[in-house]
Amino acid sequence: MLLRAAWRRAAVAVTAAPGPKPAAPTRGLRLRVGDRAPQSAVPADTAAAPEVGPVLRPLYMDVQATTPLDPRVLDAMLPYLINYYGNPHSRTHAYGWESEAAMERARQQVASLIGADPREIIFTSGATESNNIAIKGVARFYRSRKKHLITTQTEHKCVLDSCRSLEAEGFQVTYLPVQKSGIIDLKELEAAIQPDTSLVSVMTVNNEIGVKQPIAEIGRICSSRKVYFHTDAAQAVGKIPLDVNDMKIDLMSISGHKIYGPKGVGAIYIRRRPRVRVEALQSGGGQERGMRSGTVPTPLVVGLGAACEVAQQEMEYDHKRISKLSERLIQNIMKSLPDVVMNGDPKHHYPGCINLSFAYVEGESLLMALKDVALSSGSACTSASLEPSYVLRAIGTDEDLAHSSIRFGIGRFTTEEEVDYTVEKCIQHVKRLREMSPLWEMVQDGIDLKSIKWTQH
C-alpha cells in the first residue's frame, strides 16, 4: 500500500510540475494534404527548430505495409495498458486471472473470424514469426520421413528465406512458378507433390499485386495427397471470407497490424484434428501449448482480438466500399494516361491492393514526385532495394515496367477525396516525367524501342 501511495504521489507531482501545457491528444484526427501537423505530432527537436517550418502529413495509401490502429481497437486495449497489467500466466491472484480471461476472449475472437476452434490459435509476434513456426516447425518435426516442401516464387520474403534456411539443413524445396496472372497452375502443384512432401505453403493474397490464389482448391489437393497446407493470410484475414475447415487449411499465419490492430502481435492457426505436429522454435516457459514460449502481451492480443471482431462485423461493407474506390482509381488513371499496365489478374484480385506500371517513367522518380501521398513501389520488407520486384519478374513483367510500378493501397479509412487527389497528382506527375523522357519522345515519334541497338560507352 505504501508503495502504491508513493507511486500515486509521484504521478501527481509529475502532472503538476511546471512547464508547457501538453497538447490535446490527436487520436481520431484525420490529417489531409496541406494541413499542419498538430504540435503534439511534431518531434520535440523539430518543433523547437524554426527553420524547419510546417510539417505536412501526406495522404496514406500504403495499407499493405501497415494499417492505422482502429480507434475501437485502441479503446479495447487501453484498460490492459493501464489498469489490468497482470501476467496472464500468473494463476494465483486476480491480476493474472483478469489478463488470462482477456487473452482467452481474444483467442475466441481470432478463431471466430476464420472458423477455427480457439484451442487452435497460438499467439505470436506477427506473421513473420508465424510463417517461421509453420514452415520450419512442420519440416523439422517430420524430417525423419519427409524432407520435401513446396512453395511459390512469389511468396513473402520471410517464407522464401525460411525455405532457403531449410535447404541449408538438407531439405529439398520446390519453388513453383506462377502464370502471368500471378496464379499458380494447379496441375503443376499436383505434379510437384512427392511421397516425402510434408508441407505446401501458398499465400492467400499477394502483398505486392493483390492476386488471390485458389486456396480452397489447393487445400483439397493437399488433403487428398495427405500433405499439410499452410497459407500466409496476413493480407487476407479480415478482408475476404476465410474458413479453415471449408478450405482444408492446416496452418494459417495472421498479422495484427495488417487488420487495423497493433504492431508486434499476430497468430498462427494450427489444426488439432487431424493434429498437425510442430517443433517449437524457441525454448522457455512452455506458454501457448509449448509452441511459442514467452509471456503473452495482454494489451496486444486484446487489440488483435478486437481488430478481428471489428473486421468480422464490417468485412462485407468494407469490401464493397474499397471495391468502388479501387475501380474509381484504376478507371480514372487509365482513361487519362496511355501505356499503364495493371499487374496481376484483375478478376482474382483483392481490390484494396492495386499495382500499376507506368511505362517510360521510373518508379522511384514518381514516388519522389508524389511526396504528398504515402505510396510504395512494392513490399515494405524489400522496398529499400533498387532491384525490380521479384514478384513482378516472376509474372513475366519486363524489367522496364517492373521498375515503373507503384502499389496503391486502399483501406477502411481511405476516402473518395483522397483517391481523387491521388489520381490527379499521379496523372500530373506521370505526364511531367514522360515529357522529360527521351524514350517517351521516341515512342511518340513512332520509333520501335526494341529495334534500337544500344551501345555502351
Curated annotation (Swiss-Prot):
HAMAP family: Cys_desulf_IscS. It comes from the Eukaryota. Disulfide bonds: none annotated. InterPro entries: Aminotrans_V_dom, Aminotrans_V_PyrdxlP_BS, Cys_deSase_IscS, Cysteine_dSase, PyrdxlP-dep_Trfase, PyrdxlP-dep_Trfase_major, PyrdxlP-dep_Trfase_small. NCBIfam families: IscS (TIGR02006), PRK02948.1 (NF002806), PRK14012.1 (NF010611). One of its GO terms (biological process) is molybdopterin cofactor metabolic process. It comes from Homo sapiens (Human). The modification N6-(pyridoxal phosphate)lysine is found at residue 258. Active only in complex with LYRM4. The modification Cysteine persulfide is found at residue 381. [2Fe-2S] cluster binds at residue 381. Keywords: Cytoplasm, Cytoskeleton, Disease variant, Iron, Iron-sulfur, Metal-binding, Mitochondrion, Molybdenum cofactor biosynthesis, Nucleus, Primary mitochondrial disease, Pyridoxal phosphate, Transferase, Transit peptide. Its EC number is 2.8.1.7. PANTHER family: CYSTEINE DESULFURASE (PTHR11601:SF34), CYSTEINE DESULFURYLASE FAMILY MEMBER (PTHR11601). Belongs to the class-V pyridoxal-phosphate-dependent aminotransferase family. NifS/IscS subfamily. Zn(2+) binds at residue 381. Optimum temperature is 46 degrees Celsius. SUPFAM superfamilies: PLP-dependent transferases. Its cofactor is pyridoxal 5'-phosphate. The keyword Glycoprotein does not apply. This is Cysteine desulfurase. Optimum pH is 8. N-gluconoylated. Cysteine persulfide intermediate is reduced by thiol-containing molecules like glutathione and L-cysteine. Persulfide reduction is a rate-limiting step of cysteine desulfurase catalytic cycle.
